[in-house]
């Protein structure tokens, strides 16, 4: 069995809010990130994805969570990242980016991404390992279209 891999960034500002980007292809907010390409390590992918999606240069601080969507044969790496440069901007994938307090997320935030941000905010020294049971982002998009 081969797993597809994704890598997402949890980026906190000085007030403890988390950066989310708004997708162009659907009306949802998500953590910046995406697929790990062939020949790329997950920590390299998250740095590339953040730069491409929201214009920020980041440095990976730690692996906060590892999530295995068994039914999808997918593994998601969630990294806490620190901004080292760049400026928030839009892209082909993102039409907005903003920091949100975890208790004041937009109603149209992907459930799985909100959960990853909350896990990272716990600040646990060990990586959180989870098999998610809620709806995937794809399922949320289908439900919102129906």
Region locations from a protein language model:
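Conserved N-terminal beta-strand and adjoining loop/helix that marks the start
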Residues: 1-18
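Short, well-ordered beta-strand micro-motif
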Residues: 11, 78-82, 98-101
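Conserved Nudix-box catalytic region and its N-terminal flanking loop in Nudix hydrolases
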Residues: 13-52
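Short helix-loop capping/hinge motifs at secondary-structure junctions, enriched
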Residues: 17-18, 86-89
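Nudix hydrolase/Nudix homology domain
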Residues: 27-29, 93-146
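Structural detector for helix-capping/boundary residues
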Residues: 34, 48, 61, 100-103
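Active-site segment of metal-dependent pyrophosphate-handling enzymes
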Residues: 55-87
